[in-house]
Swiss-Prot record:
InterPro entries, per database record: Aminoacid_DH-like_N_sf, NAD(P)-bd_dom_sf, THF_DH/CycHdrlase, THF_DH/CycHdrlase_cat_dom, THF_DH/CycHdrlase_CS, THF_DH/CycHdrlase_NAD-bd_dom
GO molecular function: methenyltetrahydrofolate cyclohydrolase activity; methylenetetrahydrofolate dehydrogenase (NADP+) activity
Pfam families: THF_DHG_CYH, THF_DHG_CYH_C
Record function comment: Catalyzes the oxidation of 5,10-methylenetetrahydrofolate to 5,10-methenyltetrahydrofolate and then the hydrolysis of 5,10-methenyltetrahydrofolate to 10-formyltetrahydrofolate.
Annotated PROSITE patterns: THF_DHG_CYH_1 (PS00766), THF_DHG_CYH_2 (PS00767)
Lineage: Bacteria, Pseudomonadati, Pseudomonadota, Betaproteobacteria, Burkholderiales
Name the UniProt record assigns to this protein: Bifunctional protein FolD 1
Subunit details: Homodimer.
Catalytic activity as recorded in UniProt: (6R)-5,10-methylene-5,6,7,8-tetrahydrofolate + NADP(+) = (6R)-5,10-methenyltetrahydrofolate + NADPH; (6R)-5,10-methenyltetrahydrofolate + H2O = (6R)-10-formyltetrahydrofolate + H(+)
One Gene Ontology CC term in the entry: cytosol
Pathway involvement of the protein, from the record: One-carbon metabolism; tetrahydrofolate interconversion
Sites where the protein binds NADP(+): G165, A166, S167, S190, I231
Superkingdom field: Bacteria
């Protein structure tokens, strides 16, 4: 068996085209969706992510504002800037690129973003709405994973779904979305005993640990759908995921690649959330 590849790049392109149509409809009403991306410091990976997000916005016709500040910006100064963006009617979404410098409290900064502009879906109000099945914004990466599963026609109702990684950004919201779709959920973390015994039960396996090649083919149920959220640099300098692709694709039924899988979908769903924010503001 050789797993079919879930092409996140192609799916994200279709979603971006749909976003562009929605942007045109809003623009015709005098509303141009606007996203502000705030970057503090000079982390190279963050700069790449921000550049990709801004480029995607512009290509889809959204108004994008990139605000970059030095690493010695004070937390008070950042909060003041976020407050100004909250009050700016031309900005419908605000994204603060993580990680922040150590002298800043990331939770405090995220909570300062108006919930209706929190297009990352990290604000505690949006996390609570997601928990109760009434999400205002779904976090972009888990949202993208759900779209990938939908595109593959994966039957989630009654399926065994195992998530490796319990972060607030991916693991926990991923569990909520899969649970709401009718799947039976297991979340694994660094304390999980016999990880392979858990992952081999999964009809759907989502891996988000930041550890290259952590999951190999021996840990996968034959025919399972595997979504690799990880993005790492291997010893050879190339991008790789948390799943060992060579062995996994001989066992899985379908698998997302790295790169070209979840990454493009995360950006696509950020655009979707921003357009939804603009549509609500225009209603």
């Amino acid at each position: 068996m050789t797993a079919r590849i879930i092409d996140g790049a192609a799916l994200s392109q279709r979603i971006r085209e749909e976003v562009a149509q929605r942007v045109q409809a809003l623009t015709a009403k005098g509303v141009r969706p606007g996203l502000a991306v705030v970057l503090v410091g000079d982390d190279p990976a963050s700069q790449v992510y921000v550049r990709n997000k801004v480029a995607a916005c512009e290509k889809a016709g959204l108004h994008s504002v990139k605000e970059q500040y030095p690493a010695d910006l004070t937390e008070a100064q950042l909060l003041e800037r976020i407050d100004a963006l909250n009050r700016d009617p031309s900005i419908h979404g605000i994204l603060v690129q993580l990680p922040l410098p150590r002298h800043m409290d990331a939770h405090k900064v995220i909570e300062a973003i108006a919930a209706e502009k929190d297009v990352d879906g990290f604000h505690i109000s949006n996390a609570g709405l997601l928990m109760t099945g009434q999400p205002l914004f779904r976090p972009c990466t888990p949202y993208g994973v759900m779209k990938m599963l939908e595109s593959e026609g994966v039957a989630l109702r009654g399926a065994e779904a195992v998530i490796v990684g319990a972060s607030n950004i991916v693991g926990k919201p991923m569990a909520m979305l899969l649970l709401q779709a009718g799947a039976t959920i297991t979340i694994c973390n660094s304390k999980t005993r016999d990880l392979g015994a858990q992952t081999r039960r999964a009809d759907v396996l989502v891996v988000a640990t930041g550890k290259p090649g952590m999951i190999d083919g021996s840990m996968i149920k034959p025919g399972a759908v595997v979504i690799d959220v990880g993005i790492n640099r291997g010893a050879d300098g190339k991008l790789c995921g948390d799943v060992d692709m060579a062995s996994a694709r001989e066992v899985a039924g379908a698998i997302s690649p790295v790169p070209g899988g979840v990454g493009p979908m995360t950006i696509a769903m950020l655009l979707v959330n921003t357009v939804e924010a603009a549509e609500r503001a225009a209603a």
